[in-house]
């Protein structure tokens, strides 16, 4: 019964809340882990009490989970029981009144310009994998793209002659890329990306299919471990490093936000206040690898 109820809950979220696939997966994972915990303690999910949830949160803390992870788990559990209560599957919501632990705000981790240079000076090799990986990492630092945006790029979205890429996932935008990224992409497209019939994705795995989110993370971690074990490197850290280095070098916040895809809201109009030529000018002046 629990599995079918969780399925109904996730379907409700999908239809009514319009959550991303990753967010839905987080809800599913959090709720299923809580149900497993209750099952191991002989507790039916319909009979859970406030103390059951509080004890579970304490259990997560004892497991060394971060406050952010515990807060997210509680948020998922609350959503699950709000749903059950609204659908009259339970008479009382046991999650009501439980507050999440305060999450400590940490300074965002970024790489130094020297660390980025060390990373991108690595000998990636000239085979299919090496050319792809070099182009991927160069582009991520050059553009500040999210993983989902990088893997969604198509060949037709890249204009190497003009030094621009078109990002179509999320808020569509045209952003400049520097000479290092252009050179790496050109070499990858010409020598490393083998034509695959019907496959338009820019970045492919070694089987000729579109690179996945997990594949992208794996590539980044591989080179972090090779270059400097313990180096804090994830796709999001590359994105944050792009923004921080631009701002440190004097770029204005508004232009950097436009490049990152943030919407600037003025009254009832959502305006792109930075022209393409202005963005290119700022990029060439302030990006370390323009």
From Swiss-Prot:
Instruction: List GO BP terms, alphabetically.
Output: cell division; chromosome segregation; DNA recombination
**Which SUPFAM superfamilies does the UniProt record give?**
DNA breaking-rejoining enzymes (SSF56349)
Alphabetical UniProt keywords: Cell cycle, Cell division, Chromosome partition, Cytoplasm, DNA integration, DNA recombination, DNA-binding
Can you provide one Gene Ontology molecular function annotated for this UniProt record?
DNA binding
Any Pfam family the entry gives: Phage_integrase
**Gene3D superfamilies hit by this protein:** 1.10.150.130, Intergrase catalytic core
PROSITE patterns attached to this UniProt entry: CB (PS51900), TYR_RECOMBINASE (PS51898)
Protein name as catalogued: Putative tyrosine recombinase TTE1313
In which organism is this protein found?
A: Caldanaerobacter subterraneus subsp. tengcongensis (strain DSM 15242 / JCM 11007 / NBRC 100824 / MB4)
